[in-house]
A protein has these predicted regions:
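Conserved AMP-binding/adenylation subdomain of ANL enzymes
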Residues: 1-78, 82
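Conserved AMP-binding/adenylate-forming
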Residues: 39, 76-163
Length: 163
């Protein structure tokens, strides 16, 4: 709650909560209506929106051919990113994803189209956010770097090769 409410409240942000049980359609409509600047979400919400609204449009033979053509694929990916951005309200800086593991297929897709997302890590028991990186410096498959004034220790016999 500290990261999702208090931080934004102290900085003068408007905070919107859904008044209905969320579904991909309700959430997508809320993004269109509210046009948020920052989106903080669990992976499942982002994955459902991508799988239901985006993947069906790009998983046909024509799109597969276009996405495998070197020069054309860049333009197609740019257009796909634009459409995905529109699906999230077209007004945000980045989407911060956390609370569970992020599906690798969806993460690879978002990275491929150069979508502004990042994955953070927090632990409700000790801190609202422990690791975070801006989407411009985020490394896919990671959960960012330790935030300022946070010390992180990996308690493992082999901290360099954690599975």
């Amino acid at each position: 709650m500290a990261f999702e409410f208090i931080f934004e409240f102290l900085h003068g942000c408007h905070i919107f909560y859904l008044t209905r049980v969320p579904s991909p359609a309700i959430i997508a409509q809320a993004f269109t209506d509210v046009k948020p600047k920052i989106i903080i979400s669990v992976p499942l919400i982002i994955e459902k929106i991508i799988r239901k609204k985006v993947f069906p449009k790009i998983q046909n033979n024509r799109m597969r051919i276009l996405l495998n053509m070197p020069y054309v694929s860049k333009k197609v990916n740019r257009k796909i990113c634009e459409q995905v951005t529109n699906a999230f309200g077209n007004n945000f800086y980045e989407i911060i994803i956390g609370g569970a593991a992020f599906n690798q297929e969806v993460e690879s897709f978002l990275k491929k189209i150069d979508f502004p997302y990042t994955v953070g890590y927090g632990s409700t028991e000790c801190a609202p956010i422990i690791c975070y990186s801006d989407y411009k410096t985020f490394v896919p498959g990671s959960c960012g770097r330790a935030v300022v004034h946070m010390e992180v220790k990996i308690d493992s016999p082999d901290p360099e090769n954690i599975p």
